[in-house]
């Protein structure tokens, strides 16, 4: 019966209200209610779009023309998709128009990195259906990537490209992990819109399918998508899985990295997969990086991203990663990019006066006189006064033999001084010193008092003279 016994200590531990955290209580998951959609009338949307005028025309979507609309007395900017009602063929209830399909999906799913549905309008008299969605003022990702206009240089930043890729990956992952799975089937740069805050939003759900793979509706829906982004293993309705979206996203990722279109007849090979994957396999990651990117990332960052893109476009669907793995990879890459940039800025600031002036270096010969007393020893052919010299000790890249060279820095002259190979031989030695003439902002360092070395006679500090040489 010892299992049922309890003592005072255990009783106090159980009843200790001081250490009890109310946040640890198991919370009942809240039900996610579908977003409330507004039902507009046709006349209201006609006024908001100036009669669907050409001045309000934004573009053409997968199932209609898109217009800019000003609603609620100018308080709400929206985009209106106008499409014609089509009659279904036969009595097959599974045949749903793209606009009805988009209304069904967007009425169930809502995400901050998606172009969400505000409302809709059905006008049977005019045989027209209209979708009212969020307005994206900065166009498509395709326009920003491939526009030749000098004004469209907004994606010259590597960090911004990675941010857009991560936002779309999160949106696709949210679709795949929704309460009822959604497969987009048409992920491409034209369906990625940029909002007013510079964020990427996934749009156009006309071809998307909602439901389990075993649903009858999905089994009889023929393959669809855009050439260049379409999964090559998706040949029949039964082949559809979430990995088809992964393939399309891999094409989009290669497009973001390289700046090339999915299909470009101006290049050979014209398909971005046939061009990029062999380069990635050879390890030539810089060759696929867009030249328009100003702050090009380091090798390790490009490699990680390029390998993930190559995995996404594998011909076998089962070998592709899921979107959760893609999201985690992009998060890591986005964290690495600022870290590398910060290290690069520090490295550039540190080596600004040492490495950036290598083209303006000069070699002079310094004659060192060893004869006589220490007072008579002197260094000739050096114009810098000892009183004006300040030192900075900068270790170079570690060598395999534990021997290091040191760079002596001054406000006016920098000299690279290494071990003297002729030390101890003869009374006079000619030592070659490489002087680096500074032209940039000097490095701020603490001043140190210098003295002459007993063995060579070159100006050195106590810190340098006392350092062990291996």
Swiss-Prot record:
Residues 52-333 form the Protein kinase domain. Its EC number is 2.7.11.1. ATP binds at residues 58-66, 81. Belongs to the protein kinase superfamily. Ser/Thr protein kinase family. The modification Phosphothreonine is found at residues 221, 226. GO terms for molecular function: ATP binding; protein serine kinase activity; protein serine/threonine kinase activity. This is Serine/threonine-protein kinase-like protein At1g28390. The active site is at residue 186. The modification Phosphotyrosine is found at residue 234. It is an enzyme of class 2 (transferase). Disulfide bonds: none annotated. The lineage of its organism: Eukaryota, Viridiplantae, Streptophyta, Embryophyta, Tracheophyta. The keyword Kinase applies. It catalyses: L-seryl-[protein] + ATP = O-phospho-L-seryl-[protein] + ADP + H(+); L-threonyl-[protein] + ATP = O-phospho-L-threonyl-[protein] + ADP + H(+).
């Amino acid at each position: 019966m010892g299992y049922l016994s309890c003592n005072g200590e255990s009783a106090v531990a159980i009843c200790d209200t001081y250490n009890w955290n109310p946040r640890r209580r198991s919370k009942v998951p809240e039900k996610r209610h579908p977003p409330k959609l507004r039902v507009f009338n046709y006349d209201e949307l006609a006024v908001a779009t100036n009669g669907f005028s050409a001045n309000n025309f934004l573009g053409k979507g997968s199932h209609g023309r898109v217009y800019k609309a000003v609603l609620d007395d100018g308080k709400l900017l929206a985009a209106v998709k106008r499409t014609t009602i089509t009659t279904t063929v036969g009595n097959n209830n599974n045949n749903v128009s793209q606009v009805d399909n988009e209304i069904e999906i967007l009425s169930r799913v809502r995400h901050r990195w998606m172009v969400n549905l505000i409302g809709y309008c059905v006008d049977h008299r005019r045989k027209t259906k209209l979708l009212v969605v969020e307005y994206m003022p900065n166009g498509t990702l395709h326009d920003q990537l491939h526009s030749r206009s000098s004004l469209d240089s907004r994606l010259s930043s590597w960090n911004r490209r990675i941010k857009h890729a991560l936002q779309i990956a999160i949106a696709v992952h949210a679709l795949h992990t929704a309460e009822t799975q959604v497969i987009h089937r048409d992920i491409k740069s034209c369906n990625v819109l940029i909002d007013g805050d510079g964020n990427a939003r996934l749009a156009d759900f006309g071809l998307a399918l909602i439901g389990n793979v075993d649903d009858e509706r999905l089994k009889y829906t023929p393959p669809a998508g855009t050439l260049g982004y379409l999964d090559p293993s998706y040949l029949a309705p039964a082949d559809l899985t979430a990995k088809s979206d992964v393939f399309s996203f891999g094409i989009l990722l290669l497009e973001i990295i390289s700046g090339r279109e999915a299909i470009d007849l101006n290049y050979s090979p014209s398909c971005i997969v046939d061009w990029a994957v062999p380069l990635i396999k050879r390890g030539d990651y810089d060759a696929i990086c867009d030249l328009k990117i100003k702050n090009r990332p380091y090798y390790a960052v490009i490699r990680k991203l390029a390998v993930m893109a190559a995995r996404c476009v594998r011909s076998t669907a089962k070998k592709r990663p899921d979107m959760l793995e893609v999201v985690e990879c992009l998060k890591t890459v986005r964290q690495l990019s600022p870290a590398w940039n910060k290290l690069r800025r520090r490295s550039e600031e540190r080596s600004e006066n040492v490495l950036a002036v290598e083209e303006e270096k000069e070699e002079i010969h310094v004659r060192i006189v060893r004869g006589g007393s220490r007072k008579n020893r002197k260094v000739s052919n050096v114009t810098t006064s000892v009183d004006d010299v300040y030192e900075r000790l900068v270790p170079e890249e570690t060598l395999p033999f534990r021997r290091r060279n040191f760079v002596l820095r001054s406000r006016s002259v920098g000299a690279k001084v290494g071990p003297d190979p002729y030390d101890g031989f003869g009374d006079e030695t000619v030592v070659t010193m490489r002087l680096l003439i500074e032209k940039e902002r000097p490095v701020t360092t603490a001043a140190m008092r210098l003295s002459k070395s007993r063995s060579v006679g070159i100006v050195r500090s106590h810190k340098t003279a006392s350092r062990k040489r291996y």
